[in-house]
């Protein structure tokens, strides 16, 4: 069972799983099985499960939990980013909260997010390779150059930077580029990593 199935399980229109007993191990999981598996996955990968469930609007509580997990991670790694590490306690905490909140929102974006769908590939992540299409005489596709194959645009990091600048008025462009941006990007990447960990654990406990 993969995390995608968790989203389907919570959809009222999904007929995929029920509370009826399974005839064989290969049959669809029952509702009880799914809830038990989710509980096990949450105990081992709480960050990833919260991030995924929050992203898919399964729980508002999970959204806040995911941001809290991300803030903990940010505090843990902030020492690697000099411009952030040297901030005073209260200011540093507020900056990390801002970065974690915006980074999680970036992670949550998809082609279904209003205004985020790539205008070149219309959310498919694929585009026509004109040169090869002309060369081969048939349609040849390639990764969309605008969205890099994901089908949507990332949240503009400038919004996070503006919020940080309100907390650190004297933040310079070099400091932002060398410390704030790398930390922000690391937080977004961590969300995807934690989701992948949760996905693997959920798959393992439902085999």
Model-derived features: where do they sit?
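N-terminal alpha-helical interaction blocks
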Residues: 1-108
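N-terminal pre-domain and mature-chain start segments
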Residues: 90, 94, 105-109, 113, ...
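Short, flexible, mixed-charge glycine/proline-rich loop motifs
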Residues: 101-117, 125, 134-139
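Short cysteine-rich clusters marking metal-coordination/redox-active sites
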Residues: 118-121, 144-147
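Transmembrane alpha-helical hairpins and terminal membrane-anchor modules
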Residues: 139-145, 153
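Long, charge-rich boundary regions
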Residues: 148-207
């Amino acid at each position: 069972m993969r995390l995608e199935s968790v989203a389907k399980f919570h959809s009222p229109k999904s007929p995929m799983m029920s509370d009826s007993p399974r005839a064989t191990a290969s049959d669809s999981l029952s509702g009880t099985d799914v809830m038990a598996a989710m509980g096990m996955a949450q105990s081992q990968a709480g960050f990833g499960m919260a991030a995924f469930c929050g992203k898919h609007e399964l729980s508002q509580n999970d959204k806040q939990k995911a941001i809290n997990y991300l803030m903990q991670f940010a505090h843990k790694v902030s020492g690697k980013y000099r411009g952030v590490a040297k901030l005073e306690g209260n200011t540093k905490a507020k900056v990390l909260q801002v970065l974690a909140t915006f980074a999680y929102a970036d992670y949550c974006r998809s082609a279904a997010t209003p205004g985020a769908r790539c205008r070149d590939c219309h959310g498919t992540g694929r585009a026509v390779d004109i040169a090869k299409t002309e060369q081969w005489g048939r349609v040849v596709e390639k990764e969309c150059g605008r969205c890099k194959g994901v089908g949507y645009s990332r949240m503009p990091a400038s919004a996070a930077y503006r919020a940080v600048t309100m907390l650190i008025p004297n933040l310079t462009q070099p400091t932002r580029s060398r410390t704030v941006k790398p930390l922000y990007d690391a937080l977004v990447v961590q969300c995807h990593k934690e989701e992948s960990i949760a996905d693997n654990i959920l798959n393992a406990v439902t085999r």
